[in-house]
Design a protein with these regions (language model features):
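Signature of alpha-helical transmembrane segments and their immediate interfacial
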Residues: 1-37
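Envelope-exposed proteins and targeting segments
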Residues: 66-68, 99, 159-161
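Charged, often glycine-rich, active-site loop that binds/positions anionic groups
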Residues: 88, 113-130, 228-236
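Solvent-exposed, non-transmembrane loop/terminal regulatory segments of multi-pass membrane proteins
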Residues: 34-78, 84, 130-133, 137-153
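Short amphipathic beta-strand/extended segments in non-transmembrane regions
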Residues: 71-73, 88-112
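Hydrophobic C-terminal alpha-helix "anchor/cap" residues
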Residues: 10, 94-95, 206
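Acidic-histidine catalytic/liganding microenvironments
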Residues: 13, 97-100, 209
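Extracytoplasmic
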Residues: 60, 130-246
């Protein structure tokens, strides 16, 4: 039956079928302008996921900043003068980016057990690993043995350090209740473009510091941007493949 339909309808009316296909193609092409890709922190989690609900609760209660995470494994020891200077240089370079709010590294952690002074004095005038008048070995061991910082800003073996890059809050839409859907979507698209540009900028910085050790980039903004890039690329490749096949 399918063969008869193909022979009697399609093969005998090639022009009509071609016109119908072209109309369908142009119709789908016209409405494709309304196709949107979304990859935000919430879309990366399943709706109803307990982790997502917990994230919403914490965000509503305390507020939050988006952030990126870097891992830094220096070529030399973590507390060698070269590694510390390189980490400081990397921090200041990232912090100079206009979309970065702050950068937290191993060198910003207060050392409270690095001297024998009274606790109150140590709290008021705490030292960090970047200070020259401290025992770096003792300070590093304090951080490494801390249940608060171990596996958070420093790996258990002491070879890899974490870097937190806090991103400035996005400017909210003013009078959102008076905005049209198109204006809101345009604002979202602008934020996505800014996020993509931010990821490109920090990757350029990381690339320029590749000689000091191994540096990796992570964080939800990066994952979201990479997902968007990969999906767009796959859509183009798949679309061209189907077009060539047809």
């Amino acid at each position: 039956m399918i063969t008869q339909f193909y022979q009697n309808i399609i093969l005998k009316n090639p022009k009509s079928i071609l016109i119908i296909l072209l109309i369908a193609l142009f119709t789908f092409g016209y409405y494709s302008k309304d196709f949107k890709l979304d990859a935000s922190s919430e879309t990366l989690l399943i709706e109803g996921d307990p982790d997502l609900e917990y994230l919403k609760e914490i965000t509503n209660r305390y507020g939050s900043k988006e952030f990126l995470i870097l891992t830094y494994t220096p070529n030399e020891g973590m507390i060698s003068d070269v590694s510390i200077n390189n980490l400081l240089s990397l921090k200041y370079k990232i912090q100079s980016l206009n979309w970065v709010h702050s950068v937290i590294t191993l060198l910003d952690i207060p050392l409270l057990n690095n001297s024998d002074a009274p606790l109150q004095e140590r709290l008021e005038n705490f030292k960090t690993l970047k200070d020259e008048d401290i025992d770096k070995e003792r300070g590093f061991n304090e951080i490494l043995s801390s249940p608060v910082f171990r596996n958070f800003v420093i790996s258990e073996d002491g070879k890899t350090s974490g870097i937190i890059v806090n991103i400035k809050n996005k400017k909210p839409i003013e009078n959102i209740s008076n905005k049209t859907k198109e204006e809101i979507e345009a604002h979202k698209d602008l934020i996505k473009k800014q996020n993509h540009q931010n990821i490109l900028e920090i990757r350029d910085v990381i690339k320029s510091y590749n000689n000091i050790g191994k540096i990796n980039l992570g964080g939800i903004p990066m994952i979201a941007d990479d997902m968007m890039t990969f999906i767009k690329s796959d859509i183009v490749v798949f679309g061209l493949g189907v077009l060539l096949f047809i």
